[in-house]
Structures are given as C-alpha cells and as structure tokens.
Amino acid sequence: LFPDVTYSFYDVWADLYRIPYECQKLDEDFKLVKEDYYKENGGVIFPNPNAPTGIYEDLSVVEDIIAHNQDVIVIVDEAYIDFAGRSALELIDKYDNLIVVQTFSKARSMAGMRIGYAISNPTLIKYLNDAKYSFNSYTMNQTSIVCGVEAVKDREYFENGVRKIVETREWAKEELTKLGFTYLDSGSNFIFAKHPEYDAKELFEALKA
C-alpha cells in the first residue's frame, strides 16, 4: 500500500519487480487517511513529508499506521524530514517491522553523490544486506563515501543550510500569498501552490518565455 499522490517511483519499482500494489487516496487536504492502511496487505510505504505535496504527517499518525501493520514491513521515506518535524527514527526500537529511509540528496544538497541509507533493527538490516549483496555489493564509490563522511562531521554547516532553506520557504509563502496563490503547508524544501486565475500550464509557459 502507498498513497496515490506520492513519489513517482514507488509504482515503477513495484511494476519492475512484479509486486502487486494498491494506491490509497489522500483526503481533500492531501493528507493520509490512516484508516485506509488498516486493511490486510503485503507491506506499506509512504513518504513523510510527502512529495509532491510537501505535507508532513504528525508522528502520531505515522505510529498509528505502523502499529496497525505489525505483521508486515512499514517503510517511512524521510527524504525531506530535516525540513519538517519529528522523525520516525525514535520508533525504531519500539517496532520490529519499521524501516526508515533517508538521503543526503535533499537537506545536505548532495544528490550527485547518490547517498541513501536505511535504518531498522539488526534482523531487517541483515535481510536488506543479503538482498543488496546479491545484486551489487559496492553501491557507493570512494568519492561518495569520503564526501558523505565529511558532510556528517560538519553539523554546523548542515544545520545552517537547513535553517536558511526553511526561512526561504516561509518567505516564499508570504510572497506567493501577495500574488494571490494558495498553497499547502509545506514541510519540505518546495511548495505545492496554485492560482485561482491561471492553471499550471499557463504559469509554466509564462515563466519559460
């Protein structure tokens, strides 16, 4: 199970590996309907904050979904969590079925290094490593490893960068409001906005010109 409006590669990978899936509709505010994830399923994945909406779900909602799916794996994709609120990492020791995935591509601005990682209990990590080693034992090059290590060391630079991005996001919201836009309350580094008089294609073409 995963949301119908979400990261575009969930269904791509599911189709590639012939994994059947079911998309769950978001509510009218583009938020998860947690009860839709109570049904029997083979696994759950969802991003928090979501992309492309930017919506951040409170940790209580995340935990509720995990708690109702303890017989299957629940993956919380936290690519944008550094711009939002509390992480599901604090639930790792409480739920054996939880995997939290994060990346250096967003808040650390290192998309080109292709650094991503999963955090879970030792048993699930072992299973992930078994699967990884059967496909590609060396998923990161030396340059990425060195850059990743140095990025982790410089916590001050990272925190300052996140702070500036969040400040810019809030400034952008104010400016969009002045221009007549409405938008969702973003917990990411982007804003999902619309204008009552112009559709997305018109705006795109005008900006492109």
Predicted regions and their residues:
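Short beta->alpha connector loops at strand-helix junctions that form conserved
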Residues: 3-4, 23-27, 102
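Conserved PLP-anchoring active-site segment centered on the Schiff-base-forming lysine
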Residues: 1-13, 20
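PLP-dependent aminotransferase class I/II
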Residues: 97-177, 181-184
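Short, structured coil segments at secondary-structure junctions
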Residues: 17-18, 94-95, 179
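Short glycine-rich anion-binding loops that position phosphate/pyrophosphate groups of nucleotides
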Residues: 7, 48-52, 106, 189
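Conserved PLP-binding catalytic core of the aspartate aminotransferase-like
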Residues: 166, 178-207
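Active-site phosphate-binding strand-loop segment of PLP-dependent enzymes
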Residues: 22, 27-82
